Amino acid sequence: MDSCDFRGLTSRRRTSNLKNYFVGATPLQKRLELVRRQNSDFPSPSRRKIPQCSQLQEDIDPQKVAFLLHKQWTIYSLTPLYKFSYSNLKDYSRLLSAFIVAEKQKGVAVEVGEDFNIKVIFSTLLGVKGTQRDHEAFLVQILSKSQSSREHREDKVLWTGWFCCVFGESLQETVSEDFTCLPLFLANGAESNTSLIRDWFQKTFDCCFSPLAISAFNLSWMAAMWTACKMDRYMATTEFLWSVPCSPQSLDISYAIHPEDAKALWESVHKTPGEVTQEEVDLFMNCLYSHFHRHFKIHLAATRLVRVSTSVASAHTDGKIKVSLNRSN
């Protein structure tokens, strides 16, 4: 890939008046502001530190983490859970199982604890957090019980979702101890089951789910940061998808790059050890635009980035992500 150099790009910043806003605000105003901020895409500072390997990773269950890989997740933002308790996960499993069966069998009485054809399992995801202060992530699964009496078969997983918080200190500072901050919810499975799960959580913990779209701006950040990750091996090309609005239907442009070429390009623009800056992201993307224009005479900057895919993960602007490989140490 041809090298290119863009100087003098201004860094885009999004300043926050969160601290000033909360001075004198009522508890209700604080919660409303928290909801608004969670629903406005991912925060986009002008620079981000590259997380180092944490001692928390020693607690991670490799089997559970492997289960989360290679699945497409639809992401939602989530307001804090009121009166949620990790010690009650077994009770939540029984209550949610009964709720799902009752919703699927409208008009039929259902007793909690009854033997259903489905079951729900709540379990913690130890180590899936950024700091000790972050609340523990947890996994929710809907399973279909095997109906075969002749042979023992594993229950079939119908739906999976997990709740997590990574480096969420700023969120926890705005709520009381009665609330558990797990601002990110990821779901894999039928939308009907996702809807049931959301309904139950909203009724039980007085929370609110919102679909979380990923802007083209944040997709650029993801592309740069994932390209920067050190990998044991590269299994997939780095791909970008741009959407060109036109009539009568839109046109998509796909751009595939060898992962080692993408890595070399990133290393040529990355000058700040331990962090990624907005200027570096802009340089990285503008080099791609320049290279593409040189060969195809198309200005990608005039289109809209809708998907990025790397050896680490992929993400789409409609709020769908997939994690492919673990980062090497």
From Swiss-Prot:
Keyword annotations from UniProtKB, A to Z = Centromere, Chromosome, Nucleus, Phosphoprotein
Could you tell me the Gene Ontology terms of the biological process aspect for this record?
Answer: chromosome segregation
Location comes to: Nucleus; Chromosome, Centromere
What is any one of the record's Gene Ontology cellular component terms? Answer: inner kinetochore
The UniProt record lists the keyword Cell wall biogenesis/degradation: no
Modified-residue entries (Phosphoserine), positions: 40, 54
Its quaternary organisation is: Component of the CENPA-CAD complex, composed of CENPI, CENPK, CENPL, CENPO, CENPP, CENPQ, CENPR and CENPS. The CENPA-CAD complex interacts with the CENPA-NAC complex, at least composed of CENPA, CENPC, CENPH, CENPM, CENPN, CENPT and CENPU.
The record's PANTHER family line, in alphabetical order, gives:
CENTROMERE PROTEIN L
Name used for this protein in its record = Centromere protein L
* Species per Swiss-Prot/TrEMBL record: Mus musculus (Mouse)
Tell me the lineage of the source organism: Eukaryota, Metazoa, Chordata, Craniata, Vertebrata
